[in-house]
From Swiss-Prot:
Family note: Belongs to the sea anemone type 1 potassium channel toxin family. Type 1a subfamily.
Gene Ontology CC terms: extracellular region; nematocyst
ShKT domain: residues covered: 42-74
SUPFAM superfamilies: Crisp domain-like (SSF57546)
Additional free-text comment from the UniProt record: Very weakly blocks potassium channels Kv1.5/KCNA5 (Ki=9.76 uM), Kv7.2/KCNQ2 (Ki=3.81 uM) and the heterotetramer formed by Kv7.2 and Kv7.3 (KCNQ2/KCNQ3) (Ki=6.91 uM).
Name this protein carries in UniProt: Kappa-stichotoxin-Hmg1a
Organism in which the protein naturally occurs: Heteractis magnifica (Magnificent sea anemone)
GO molecular function, one term: toxin activity
Primary localization: secreted
Cystines in this chain: C42-C74, C51-C67, C56-C71
Keyword list, A-Z: Cleavage on pair of basic residues, Disulfide bond, Ion channel impairing toxin, Nematocyst, Neurotoxin, Potassium channel impairing toxin, Secreted, Signal, Toxin, Voltage-gated potassium channel impairing toxin
Annotated PROSITE patterns: SHKT
Compartments, as annotated in UniProt: Secreted; Nematocyst
């Protein structure tokens, strides 16, 4: 019984490692596709009044699809 418990814990740990590795691989692929638009830390605010598609495209902090949700919130 104890050996089955140990085997189950090891199996769960292995599965979690596989999932984490797969997520990291997907993030690397996404970063390569986006080129210079890799994830970066937010260093300054874009005021909500200036949150436009053009401003978001040229911003280091936001991806276009997230801009409307995050402008002015850093």
């Amino acid at each position: 019984m104890k050996s089955q418990m140990i085997a189950a814990v090891l199996l769960i740990a292995f599965c979690l490692c596989v999932v984490v590795t797969a997520r990291m691989e997907l993030q690397d692929v996404e970063d390569m596709e986006n080129g210079f638009q890799k994830r970066r830390t937010c260093k300054d605010l874009i005021p909500v009044s200036e949150c436009t598609d053009i401003r978001c495209r040229t911003s280091m902090k936001y991806r276009l699809n997230l801009c409307r949700k995050t402008c002015g919130s850093c």
